[in-house]
């Protein structure tokens, strides 16, 4: 079980933004093939009225650097119009994740599915041979995963776990193909009450850390939990 510890990050002033020609959020940063790759969400001016004052995200770019100063935009790596299960008027490709396993790169992303009676968010997977793509999306989202903000932890024994937010925080094992659940989702216990999102899990020195934004007394802070 995770025991919750909380930390509040003080106010910081952003300096030297690495992306200046487009609106981005929710970055996940990974070292692949000797370079740093940053996978953010991408906000655009809304083409539809209902999203004029909300997030409007239709695709993903990836950026890479070998010195953390000079960055290359590899362009669009995935667009909602190329994902078979995503609603064409969704514009909800929010916080993504990318991991490497079995010689492939797996890109996890949330969006809203098309189809009568479909509600809420699902999480899909796209696969590539290189960290900058091209990524090929699966025809359907991961069955049993309903939420946003995917995070995938590959443990030291090779077992992969997927975490996500939506009606609390959940986790499940992934099959070796990285495309299907190998266990039933469970709710992560021991976390503080209140709205939580954006989970990120990692291991260091034999301890597992689970970080997440948390709304505490109407202010969003960064919190973390630890487990064995």
PLM regions: where:
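Bacterial Sec-dependent N-terminal signal peptides
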Residues: 1-15
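Carbohydrate-active catalytic/glycan-binding domains of CAZyme proteins
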Residues: 14-228
């Amino acid at each position: 079980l995770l025991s919750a510890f909380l930390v509040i990050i003080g106010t910081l002033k952003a300096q030297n933004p690495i992306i200046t020609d487009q609106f981005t959020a929710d970055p996940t940063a990974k070292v692949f093939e000797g370079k740093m790759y940053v996978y953010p969400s991408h906000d655009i001016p809304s083409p539809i009225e209902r999203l004029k004052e909300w997030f409007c995200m239709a695709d993903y770019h990836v950026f890479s650097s070998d010195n953390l100063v000079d960055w290359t935009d590899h362009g669009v790596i995935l667009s909602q119009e190329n994902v078979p299960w995503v609603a064409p008027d969704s514009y909800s490709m929010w916080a993504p994740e990318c991991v490497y396993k079995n010689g492939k790169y797996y890109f996890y992303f949330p969006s809203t599915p098309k189809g009568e009676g479909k509600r809420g968010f699902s999480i899909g997977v796209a696969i590539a041979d290189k960290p900058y793509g091209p990524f090929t999306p699966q025809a359907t989202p991961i069955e049993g995963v309903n939420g946003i903000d995917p995070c995938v932890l590959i443990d030291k024994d090779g077992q992969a776990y997927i975490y996500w937010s939506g009606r609390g925080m959940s986790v499940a094992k992934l099959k070796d193909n990285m495309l299907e659940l190998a266990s039933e989702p469970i709710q992560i216990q021991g976390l503080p009450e209140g709205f939580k999102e954006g989970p990120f899990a990692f291991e260091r020195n034999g301890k597992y850390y689970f970080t997440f934004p948390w709304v505490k007394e109407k202010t969003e802070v960064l919190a973390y939990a630890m487990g064995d």
